[in-house]
Design a protein with these regions (language model features):
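Positively charged, polar, low-complexity stretches
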Residues: 1-106
Length: 106
């Protein structure tokens, strides 16, 4: 019997902790610069999430956002992703891949 993939709309604390642990090993994939979140950055983020499911993003100096938390909210909304962690100028987001999901949440 095939397992059906259910769409995750919110992460539990156990799932967030698991993803935070996996994110420690991941390099920064996206950099948000002075232009902010532009269509090209959204495309790169979309492709990265499909390939990796879990990506780390860094807010560069001069970015038009007050905090990484604000940028995380905007990017998550545009990418239909879920925030995992936000520390300093970096944050981690997660979205299950539509095909070939690599990360099994607890």
């Amino acid at each position: 019997m095939e397992k059906t993939q259910k769409e995750v709309t919110e992460l539990s604390s156990k799932q967030r902790a698991y993803l935070r642990g996996r994110a420690n090993e991941e390099p920064v994939v996206l950099h948000i610069g002075k232009e902010g979140i532009v269509p090209n950055l959204i495309k790169q983020g979309w492709d990265a999430l499909e390939a990796r499911e879990l990506i780390k993003v860094q807010l560069m100096k001069g970015a038009p956002y007050e905090s990484a938390r604000e940028a995380c909210g905007v990017l998550c909304e545009k990418l239909h992703a879920l925030p995992v962690q936000c520390i300093g100028k970096r944050f981690v987001i997660y979205r299950r891949a539509r095909k070939d999901a690599k990360i099994e949440l607890p």
